[in-house]
Amino acid sequence: MSSIDKRDLRKRYRNLINKVQESRLELVDEENNNLYETITTANDLFSSVDAPTEATLDALLLTKTVDLASIKARQLHIGRPKFNIELFTKNIKQFLNYPTSHSNVTRIQEIDTAWSRLGKLASNCEKQPASLNLMVGPLSFRKKERNIQRRERLQKAPNVLTQPTMLNERNITTQENNTTKNVLHISRLLQAHQPVNFLKFITNPQSYPQTVENLFYVSFLFKEGKAALVENESGILMLETRIPPTDDQVVAGEIRNIQLVLDMTMDLYENIIKEYNIKESIIPTRAPVETSTNSNTWYG
């Protein structure tokens, strides 16, 4: 096919596409056969298509005609006679036999009689009387009253209430003194056992909580520069004492702080005991701190 034929083919395709777009309402009409003629013309044109450009136009035309054919198919009433509104209106008028009287009163009465006769005829086509569903809304309406339930305040028996522990300045001072006391005690133990395996030093095989506390107290020695971790030839961290730096050394930047985080989990705690075969704790087990209250009565 020559280039001129291709241009002509594309032109005919575009004309068909424009015709389909402009005549959508006419093409879906039941009495109109132009849609069939359009599809037939498109089939004839498709026999000359041999390039992607023309094939694209054919696909676009096919899509539009298929959409219109689907709409037209839904409008078809196969096996049903076509309902003619004009003929139906004409028959209604003949049945009613509209009055020709010039008197308004007489004319209104005759119209009412005619419509009553039509209503009786229509009632013969109904199998059941009209139900309430055809009416708008219920016959009666009762406003629902809102049921508001008041919640009563929960009253607890006085004998089961306990007074919370009241912390005052004296209690806080005592806790601070205990922390300082334990840090000094651990510092003396370190001086007596240094250099010592760091994990062996802080681990208490009889108490996991006190192992965590020992790690907490040793961190104060690191912070004050009184202890340091040194790796030995076997790669084990050894804990030993240090002389705290002076203020001049800190200001001059001669001291470099390295912050480490040790997550002492229960699994790690048990593995340390098993790995180093720890039987006794270097740091003695401390007595538990008991908290007592002066009264079991709630005041509020």
From Swiss-Prot:
Where does it reside? Answer: Nucleus
Name of the featured protein: Non-structural maintenance of chromosome element 4
Q: Which Pfam families match?
A: Nse4_C (PF08743)
Task: Give the record's GO biological process terms.
Answer: DNA repair; double-strand break repair via homologous recombination; meiotic cell cycle
**Transmembrane helix is among the record's keywords:** no
Q: How does it assemble?
A: Two subcomplexes smc5-smc6-nse2 and nse1-nse3-nse4 exist. These subcomplexes are then brought together via a number of interactions, forming the Smc5-Smc6 complex.
Q: Keywords in UniProt for this one? A: DNA damage, DNA recombination, DNA repair, Meiosis, Nucleus
Q: What function does this protein fulfil? A: Acts in a DNA repair pathway for removal of UV-induced DNA damage that is distinct from classical nucleotide excision repair and in repair of ionizing radiation damage. Functions in homologous recombination repair of DNA double strand breaks and in recovery of stalled replication forks. Plays a critical role in meiosis.
Disulphide-bonded residues: none
